[in-house]
């Protein structure tokens, strides 16, 4: 094997080591290639504006006003939350936006930098202001904990790992090469991404409950919300739950 090929895994390991940073919110070491929020926030803003330009934004309705009002309450709670932690200026770069979009899917999300969208399809399941606050707190928690940056970093890592795997296996016979690539594919799906997602959901559940409580909403509505979400799926899986794997215990939280 050529020396250049031997160096590839070394560079790979060094990249991981330098990208492991302490998460401000959780205090845990996480993989994050985006040390500065500005590039990530700029990318999020561009994608957010593109999304809104391609979908019907609902304005002037009671639900639209609720999403905006509760979003502001949760954003204010987030600032209070970080003030408790001695970091009152941590969210100064956030430029919060809250929109209700006409889509039947049961979904809501918050991009890095505070760009929030609720779909009309989730409003019936939210059912009341406390239910909206539970969803809002959960999605904002994902953004505050840098889950978007971590997911993107994991994607970069997997792409780089795939390139290394292909390079290392290039001179193997076809059968061995196929085995290596298959093993890599299974490893990234089962051993990396899915547990990572559940970890994020658990963190967002905890932080989201704190945010909605600080904002003056009833945290006991959260498990009722997840029960309604589960019942609505009727054996299927709404888009929200497909991107938010939920353990059974969460429903009794």
Identify the meaning behind each predicted range:
Residues 5-8, 20-253:
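A Zn2+-metalloprotease active-site environment signal
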Residues 1-2:
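N-terminal secretory signal peptides that target proteins for export/translocation
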